C-alpha cells in the first residue's frame, strides 16, 4: 500500500500566502471591487470589531462598503496596508497585525488591523478582524504609507 505524504508548507510560504490575501484585498478595494475585497474574509462567519462594537457580519459589511464607499474612486479612496507582522499560532491558524492608510480626497484615515486567519481547504481566510482607526492631521503622515 502506497502512502502519499503531504508536506506542510514552510513558515515562510504560509506567511507569503497570507500576505498574498492582503495584497489581493488591497488591489480589489482600489479598483472598486468590494466583493473581491470581501473574498479575504470567511463568509458568513467572520467577526468584525470596530469602533468599540461588533459589526454586521460579512454581508452587512459588504453592504456598508458599497453604500458608503461605492460609486466613484473619490468616495472609495486609495487603500494601502503596510508594516504587517504575522505570527503563525498553530497549523492552520495565524494572527496578522498591521497598519493601513485610506486616502479619500482631503480625508486621510490611518489605523491598525488585527486579523485572525484560519486555513480552510488550503486557503487562508480572515475569521476575525479588529480595526482601530483615526483621522490624520495634514502634517502627520506615516513614511511607510506613501
Please report, for each region that a protein language model flagged, where it lies by residue.
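Sequence/structural signature of outer-membrane beta-barrel proteins
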Residues: 103-105, 135-136
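Short, low-complexity N-terminal intrinsically disordered segments enriched in polar/charged residues
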Residues: 3-43, 137-146
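Short beta-strand edge/turn micro-motifs at domain boundaries
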Residues: 110-137
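A short, structured loop/turn motif at beta-sheet edges
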Residues: 86-94, 117-123
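A solvent-exposed, acidic/Ser-Thr-rich amphipathic alpha-helical stretch
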Residues: 17-21, 34-92, 101, 107-108
Amino acid at each position: 500500500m502506497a502512502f502519499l505524504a503531504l508536506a506542510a508548507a514552510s513558515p515562510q510560504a504560509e506567511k507569503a500566502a497570507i500576505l498574498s490575501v492582503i495584497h489581493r484585498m488591497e488591489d480589489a478595494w482600489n479598483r472598486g471591487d468590494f466583493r473581491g475585497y470581501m473574498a479575504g474574509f470567511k463568509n458568513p462567519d467572520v467577526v468584525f470589531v470596530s469602533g468599540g462594537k461588533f459589526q454586521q457580519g460579512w454581508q452587512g459589511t459588504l453592504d456598508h462598503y458599497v453604500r458608503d464607499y461605492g460609486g466613484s474612486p473619490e468616495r472609495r479612496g486609495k487603500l494601502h496596508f503596510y508594516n504587517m507582522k504575522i505570527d503563525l499560532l498553530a497549523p492552520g491558524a495565524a494572527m496578522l497585525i498591521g497598519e493601513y492608510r485610506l486616502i479619500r480626497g482631503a480625508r486621510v484615515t490611518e489605523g491598525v488591523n488585527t486579523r485572525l486567519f484560519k486555513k480552510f481547504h488550503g486557503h487562508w481566510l480572515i475569521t476575525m478582524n479588529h480595526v482601530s482607526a483615526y483621522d490624520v492631521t495634514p502634517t502627520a503622515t506615516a513614511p511607510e504609507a506613501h
